């Protein structure tokens, strides 16, 4: 019986880093299922509405800000 995969959302605003991280998860971590990627906060919240992951890999400096990533973390804990 195959083990259930854990669901991952990757949030990164640098496209090369986003795609590289996604490829690592898809090819090197067989227990992970990337259920979505986002380059903006708005894209991230849309993904969360579609389904809550087990893991969010989040760029804390999203959009060049030093607070957006931290605010997203706080809101995840408040909502979920």
Task: Describe each PLM feature range.
Residues 22, 35-55, 63:
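Acidic, metal-coordinating helix/loop segments flanking the phosphotransfer/catalytic sites
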Residues 66-80:
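Short amphipathic alpha-helix used as the core "switch/output" element in two-component signaling
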Residues 1-9:
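Non-catalytic signal-transmission and effector/linker regions of two-component phosphorelay proteins
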Residues 48, 57, 70-73:
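Hydrophobic alpha-helical motif in two-component signaling modules
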Residues 12:
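Conserved acidic carboxylate
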Residues 15, 39-43, 74:
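Acidic phosphotransfer microenvironment of two-component signaling modules
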Residues 16-27:
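Amphipathic alpha1 helix at the N-terminus of the CheY-like receiver
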